[in-house]
From Swiss-Prot:
One of its GO terms (cellular component) is cytoplasm. Belongs to the mago nashi family. This is Protein mago nashi homolog 1. It comes from Oryza sativa subsp. japonica (Rice). The gene is MAGO1. Gene3D superfamilies: Mago nashi (3.30.1560.10).
Length: 158
């Protein structure tokens, strides 16, 4: 695992993150998945077969400061203190998976797709699921920004 040096609020040490959300339905297996790998590689995949779309795959290497920001987001969310035992089980609507390694802590969550905050509020563990819901929103925004910026910026010609 990679070592994330510096004061990231997350204790430094090893870091790995993987998020998946998807379902199998009318258009086949549709999903969004991204992971921050130990070597700094950010992998992103988005598969939608709607109107015969093809899978989008992107890979970029990110700097240690980007990894520090990801660990800060996770640490501040306090998701590492949560337990998914009272969260909705994956169903025909879909599933979400979140796996995180930070330092010597390793968590893995699995739950159903969350359509809105109403789904969160009516669950058996609204506080824990709310933390998960907002963390996932933050991580998606972070990853989409990194991927979009990386592939839209033109290199400087010398």
């Amino acid at each position: 695992m990679a070592t994330v040096a510096g004061d990231d609020g997350g204790g430094g040490g090893e870091f790995y993150l993987r998020y998946y959300v998807g379902h199998k339905g009318k258009f086949g297996h549709e999903f969004l998945e991204f992971e921050f790998r130990p070597d700094g590689k950010l992998r992103y995949a988005n598969n939608s077969n709607y109107k015969k779309d093809t899978m989008i795959r992107k890979e970029v290497f990110v700097s240690p400061s980007v990894l520090r920001e990801a660990t800060r987001i996770i640490h501040e969310s306090e998701i590492m203190k949560e337990d998914d035992s009272n969260w909705p089980e994956p169903d025909r609507v879909g599933r979400q998976e979140l796996e995180i390694v930070m330092g010597n802590e390793h968590i893995s969550f699995t739950t159903s797709k969350i359509g809105s905050l109403v789904d969160v509020q009516t669950s058996k563990d609204p506080e824990g699921l709310r933390i998960f819901y907002y963390l996932v929103q933050d991580l998606k925004c972070f990853v989409f920004s990194l991927i979009n910026l990386h592939f839209k910026i033109k290199p400087i010609q010398s």
